[in-house]
Each structure stands twice: as C-alpha cells, then as structure tokens.
Design a protein with these regions (language model features):
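Short, Lys/Arg-enriched, Trp-marked, Pro/Gly-tolerant hinge/linker segments that flank
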Residues: 3-68, 81-89, 93
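Terminal helix-turn-helix DNA-binding modules in bacterial transcription factors
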Residues: 49, 53, 58-62, 70, ...
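ATP/adenylate-binding site constellation spanning eukaryotic-like Ser/Thr protein kinases
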Residues: 18, 96, 133
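Proline-centered helix-kink/hinge sites
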Residues: 87, 135-136
Length: 148
C-alpha cells in the first residue's frame, strides 16, 4: 500500500514540475498554439475514461500519455486547458466520488479506502475531509443507508 501512496506523490510532483516548466517556456518563449492533433477532445476523453476505469490503481503521466498518444507535457497542457483541472486533480475527484457512493452504501471504511486507491484508512480519511469538509465516518452517518 505504501507503493500506491509513493506513486501518487511521484505523479503529483511530476505533474507540478511539468506545469512549472510549461509556464517558464510560455513566459520566456511566447505562447505556441497547440497543433490541431493535440486539440482533439477524443484524446482527452480517452484519458478521462482511463482514469475512471483505473481510479483505484497507481497511474502515471507516462501511462496517460500513451493512452492519449501525446507526450506527457502536451497531455498535461491540453488536459488542463480542456478540463480546467490537472489530470491528478481529476483523478482525485473520481476517487472521492466513488468513495462517497461506497460510504452511502455502508461499505466498511477500510474497504472504501482500498477500493478507491488509497494506501490506508488514515490517508483516505485525511484526504476525504480536506476535499469534502467532513470525515468519511461523519459522511457515512449522514448519508449512509439512504435509498436512491
């Protein structure tokens, strides 16, 4: 499980590095428009589908670049431009949405953490509270057992 946490951190660090590099290049070399091939929303749609399908697994920018057929730099730039958030942030929203559904079905907290790609319950709880504003336990108490 520690590997998942480590790979998530590496993914986020690489993403931030590439965003900063892109900003430096734009600031010092002028904005270069993306070639038409990079503007195709189906490439980004394929990345979104991949992230949804593999949300409980470690994911890297290299993998996402292969899915889209783009370099990781162009993928990051194009994805962020089209979606308004980075691929990592998009993955986080998928994981939390999945966690919310599982908590509403009264799935045990440790199972929710593992099914949504978190290394342990503690990491999941901190992350969930940061994004949602309540702990997973509080969320489950409020929304758990409701029938749709």
């Amino acid at each position: 499980h520690a590997m998942i946490v480590q790979e998530d951190k590496e993914f986020r660090k690489e993403e931030i590095f590439l965003m900063l590099l892109g900003q430096l290049l734009r600031d010092n070399a002028g904005e270069t428009p993306l070639p038409d091939a990079y503007k195709d929303e189906s490439d980004i749609g394929a990345v979104c589908a991949y992230l949804e399908e593999h949300s409980g697994e470690p994911v890297s920018l290299d993998q996402l670049g292969e899915v889209a057929g783009l370099s990781k730099y162009y993928l990051l730039r194009s994805f962020t431009k089209q979606k308004g958030i980075s691929p990592y942030r998009y993955l986080e929203t998928i994981r939390i949405a999945k966690a919310r559904k599982l908590l509403e079905r009264n799935v045990p907290m440790i199972e929710v953490a593992l099914q949504t790609g978190f290394a342990d319950q503690s990491h999941f709880s901190r992350f969930f509270k940061r994004l949602i504003g309540v702990t997973p336990r509080q969320y489950a108490e409020i929304f758990g057992g409701r029938q749709a």
